[in-house]
Amino acid sequence: VGMFYFNTSNDSDKQVATLQTTSKPILLIMPIKTSGLTDDQKGFARGITESMISTLSSYQAIKVLSSSTSFHAQKTEMLDNAIRENYGVDYLIRGSMQVMGNNARLNLEITDLKAAKVTLSKKKDFNMENIFKVQDELGNEILNELSINLGVGSAQGSDWVKQWKSM
């Protein structure tokens, strides 16, 4: 999956074409699961999903699919292999949110669809009063996990961090 560029040169009346590929990892961030939450809490979970998509989409070294794709995949209950085949997704990010009073827990996992395994699972506890701060932090944390811990090509991973910090 990627973009293709063709360079042509005229060498002794022969055209020589060189295929160069550039490939960006493709991410799909599934809507945060909200079973058992109030309508207001479901709105917060949707906001977390949208914020992660927005934050990661601004980073040019990866391609993040739209929220409409995420919500469609959830609504149609697409399986991981169908998501990979239909959209070329490399990494799938899923999560769930639990709320008790003013305290919340967000569980996230990153699945490498090529390897067909969960490569990272983490939880984040926070106070609902800090929901916007949490939304802002999550995209950066996911980016760091993808580039450093998952080593999406170790050289590529460190390039991602450098490019991200220079934005």
Residues of each region from the PLM?
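Short, solvent-exposed loop/turn segments at secondary-structure boundaries
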Residues: 39-43
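Catalytic-center loop of serine/cysteine hydrolases
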Residues: 4-17, 38, 48-167
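Short glycine/proline-enriched loop/turn "hinge" motifs that connect secondary-structure elements
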Residues: 18-22
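Short beta-strand segments enriched in small/hydrophobic residues
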Residues: 23-38
